[in-house]
């Protein structure tokens, strides 16, 4: 993943090419921490909003994942989910994802980081973490990945049937 440091935020966003983004790179702890920091910078955030909105309008639609997608980026999306799980489950899932690369990682440190990020994201002035009023709450604490996806697909299918 290219880092466009030193650029004006608008110029850096214009140079981004989503075709070059490696999805696996987006799921790292470093990107997770950086995303929260970047999201609190008004100038960077404003530049990213338009980029994300344009991405969402691609032919065929798009599925976007983020803490302000339903409230700021795509407030008029046909279907929105507010996906959550208990802190313990979120940390365990993250641990499973990251422990292969980081042998010093602990569940306790991940819970602490999750709490800190959630608090920072809820309290930030720019695009705070909120559940959109019309978002479907999807608590995945007791659900497998397959069950979570099936529930989301079922909800989307119902919404499509109702809109046609």
Regions found by a protein language model. Give the residues of each.
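Alpha-helix N-cap and coil->helix boundary residues
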Residues: 8, 105-109, 130
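Conserved catalytic network of the ASCE P-loop NTPase/AAA+ motor domain
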Residues: 53-57, 72-75, 128-131
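ATP-dependent small-molecule kinase phosphotransfer cores
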Residues: 1-61, 88, 100, 111-122, ...
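Conserved phosphate-donor/acceptor-positioning beta-strand/loop module used by diverse small-molecule
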Residues: 75-96, 104-115
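Short, well-ordered beta-strand core segments
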Residues: 62, 78-82, 135-137
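NTP-dependent small-molecule kinase module
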Residues: 26, 50-51, 95-101, 120, ...
